[in-house]
Structure formats: C-alpha cells, structure tokens
C-alpha cells in the first residue's frame, strides 16, 4: 500500500525535493554572495582608511622635512647677512675705542696736562665713536628686519616646494600601484583570452601588430625627474644670496624714517620702541605684500628667466646641467605652480602671519635682553645717563641697538643638531602656514 502510494506520488515528491533543493542552493549562493559583498565593502573601507592615514603621514612628514630644511638653511643665511650687514665688527670697534679712551684717560691722570694736539685727537675719536653708534643703530635694525622677512619667505618657499613635490610623488605612486593591480586582475581573469590570443596569433588571425612607440628608458626617466626636482629645490639659493637684496632698500628707507632722527643717547620706553618697530613693519608690508607690487615679492622669492641659469650653475654639477638642458619640462611645471601659489592671497596672508609672529618673538626677546643688560655694567654701550632707572623705564637707543644684535644671533642660531631654535619653532607652529600647506598638498587637480 505504501509502495503503491510512493509510486503514485513519486513525481510530486521528486518535484518538491527538487524545488526545496533549489531553494537551499539558492539560499547558500545568496549567503555566499552577500558574505563576499560584505567582505569586499569592508576591504574597500579598510583600503580607504589606509589611504587616508597614508596621506596624513606623508603630509606630517613633509612638514617635518620642511623644518629640517630650514635648520640647514639658516646657517647659510647667517653667513650671508653677517657679511652684508656686519654688526659684530661695529660692536668690537666700539669696544676697542672705549678701551683706548680709558687708557688715554689714565695717561692724562698720571702724566699731567695733555697737549692741544692730543685734545684734537680725542675729539676726533669721540666724533667717530658717535658715528659708529649711529651706524650700529641703523644697521642692527635693518639686519633684524632682513632676518625676519628673509626667514619668513624662506619658510614659505620651502613649504611650497616640498608639498608640491610630495603631492606629485604620491600621485605617481598611486597611479603606478593602480596600474599594477589592474594588470594583476587582467592576468588572473583573462587566462582563457590569453590562450585564444596566442592561438589566433599563431594562425595569423590578429593581423599585423601595431607599431611600438619608442619609450624613454626607465633609468633615464628617473634621472631626468631627480635632476629636475633637485634643480627646483636649489632655487632657494636665489632668496638666500640675491633675493633678499631686492627688498633691502625698502627696509633701509623705512628704518630711516622711524629711527633716523634718534640719537644713540635718546631714550625710549619699550612701548615706544615697539610702536616704531611696528610702524616700520607695517610700512614694509604695504609695499612688499600690496596687490599692485607683488612683482617685488616674486623677484625676491624666485629668479627670473635671465637669472635662472646663473642660479643653477651655482648649485648643480655639469652632468645635472646637461640633463636640464636636454629636458627641463618638469622644472617649468614646478616653477609655474610655485609662482601661482606665491602670488595667491593665501600666501600673502601666511607671510603677514609669519611676520606678525616674528614681531612678537622679537619684542619678547628684546625686553628680556634689555633688562638683562641693565643688571650688569654696560661695557659696550655709551655711558648711561640714569634714564633707565626712572619710573618710566626708558632705555637708551644704544642699548636697544645692542639688544637687536643679540636678538639676530638668537634668531639665526644654528640648531641643526639639537633642533632648539625657538624662533623657527614658533614660525613652524603658525596655523595659517599649515592651512596653506594642506591646500597645496591636497590640490590633486593640478
């Protein structure tokens, strides 16, 4: 009876079993497909997270490299400014004249009356000493502002250069990796097509092969890229050696307007000196960063076409120069982008922010150094007239001049080993500088 029932409903049972089996298989396939889809999504999110972290790490490392580069360039700037605006020699000369005058006073005290001729020599010495103090007053202020503006421009230029190069390197690496992954996928999925292509080629079914375009050897391409990048980075030589001279007359003119009428014996409070220095900086900013005179800023930052070859000859060897003569297309692209960035409003805002930070640093250092010099005998300044002890706390202009000299030394301190140049650290921490660097680094549309 049961066998008869099974035989009678065998078709239905088989059909039902097939349907159930199909549903189970479909469910398993759907589950596997869903699992694979989830795995792919997780992998994609993981890759995106990795890429973002990689970009952040590269960006952070690039900014650190820029700071290290500044530590390497500051000693060069110190040598250049020390030669062009030598205030140490003036101070040593003044010290020598003070010792000489003290010796003459001792001789007059022990040897009786001095002759008329000796009095004439003494007046000459006194007059030349006054002239030296006047020169120290002007030169120390000019050097201070030259240090401020050159260092700020050098930091901006270094950030622009390294971030542009880092972005290009990242894009080239990403494209190379993407091509490699695409080739791997083609090799894994197209083995049957490869067999067919091989057979078709053997039968002549593919027709003539397309002509192969000559490609530059990899080694030569890498050499050209490397030399162009080095040439691009070496252009900071211009700012260090020639570029800062473009705005030096502007600084001298503004310093003369604010400090020219002051005598080294005149006294100013810290607030009064700060106001004069601030007025000088604002006047320089108006002419240097004004939208109508950005040509002066560009001439200071980068050499023009007539000076570019001279700069490269100073920084590259003969082999590298031959590579540049053969192909400088990458250098041209890098320079064009740097000029666009330097001319932008964002760069001007960054420069003004760096100069303002420099002013704050200078005033802090100045107050500390002036106060410290009052605690010990002023061996290298004119005799104090008691104004420094007054309640108004006014100090001689001569004392400010010597303090400015010391401030320049602090700002140009060689901290390459210990990385302890406080001035560079303060500039490197300016938020606007990081904002501009991030904008340049992430500008993948260039």
Curated annotation (Swiss-Prot):
Q: Which domain of life is it from?
A: Eukaryota
**A GO biological-process term:** ER-dependent peroxisome organization
Cytoplasmic topological intervals: 34-446
Look up and give the organism this protein is from: Eremothecium gossypii (strain ATCC 10895 / CBS 109.51 / FGSC 9923 / NRRL Y-1056)
Q: Give the protein's function.
A: Involved in peroxisome biosynthesis.
Name of this protein: Peroxisomal biogenesis factor 3
Q: What are the record keywords, sorted? A: Membrane, Peroxisome, Peroxisome biogenesis, Transmembrane, Transmembrane helix
Give the Peroxisomal membrane side ranges: 1-12
């Amino acid at each position: 009876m049961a066998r008869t029932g099974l035989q009678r409903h065998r078709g239905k049972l088989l059909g039902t079993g097939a349907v159930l089996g199909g549903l189970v298989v479909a469910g398993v396939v759907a589950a596997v497909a869903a699992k694979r889809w989830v795995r792919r999504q997780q992998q994609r999110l993981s890759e995106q997270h990795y890429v973002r972290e990689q970009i952040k790490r590269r960006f952070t490392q690039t900014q650190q490299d820029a700071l290290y580069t500044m530590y390497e360039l500051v000693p060069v700037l110190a040598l250049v400014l020390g030669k062009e605006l030598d205030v140490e020699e003036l101070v040593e000369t003044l010290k020598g004249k003070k010792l000489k005058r003290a010796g003459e006073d001792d001789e007059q005290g022990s040897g009786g009356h001095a002759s008329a001729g000796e009095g004439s020599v003494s007046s000459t010495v006194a007059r030349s000493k006054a002239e030296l103090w006047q020169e120290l007053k002007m030169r120390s202020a000019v050097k201070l502002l030259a240090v401020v503006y050159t260092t700020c421009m050098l930091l901006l230029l270094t950030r622009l250069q390294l971030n542009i190069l880092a972005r290009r390197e990242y894009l080239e690496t990403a494209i190379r990796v993407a091509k490699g992954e695409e080739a791997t996928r083609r090799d894994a999925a197209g083995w049957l097509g490869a067999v067919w292509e091989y057979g078709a080629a053997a039968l002549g079914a593919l027709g003539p092969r397309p002509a192969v375009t000559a490609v530059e050897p990899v080694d030569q391409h890498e050499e050209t890229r490397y030399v162009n990048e080095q040439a691009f980075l070496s252009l900071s030589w211009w700012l260090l050696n020639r570029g800062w001279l473009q705005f030096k007359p502007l600084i001298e003119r503004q310093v003369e307007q604010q400090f020219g009428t002051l005598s080294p014996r005149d006294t100013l409070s810290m607030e009064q000196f700060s106001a004069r220095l601030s007025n000088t900086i604002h006047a320089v900013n108006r002419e240097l960063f004004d939208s109508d005179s950005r040509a002066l800023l560009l001439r200071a930052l980068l050499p023009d076409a007539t000076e570019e070859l001279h700069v490269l000859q100073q920084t590259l060897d003969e082999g590298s120069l031959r590579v540049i003569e053969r192909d400088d297309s990458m250098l041209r692209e890098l320079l064009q982008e740097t000029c666009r960035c330097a001319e932008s409003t964002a760069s001007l805002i960054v420069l003004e922010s760096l100069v303002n930070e420099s002013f704050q640093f200078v005033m802090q250092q100045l107050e500390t150094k002036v106060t410290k010099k009052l605690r010990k005998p002023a061996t290298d300044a004119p005799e104090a007239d008691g104004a420094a002890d007054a309640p108004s706390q006014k100090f001689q202009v001569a004392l400010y001049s010597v303090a400015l000299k010391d401030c320049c030394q602090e700002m140009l301190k060689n901290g390459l080993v210990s990385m302890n140049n406080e001035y560079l650290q303060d500039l490197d921490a300016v938020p606007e500088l990081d904002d501009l660097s991030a904008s340049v680094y992430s500008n993948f549309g260039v």
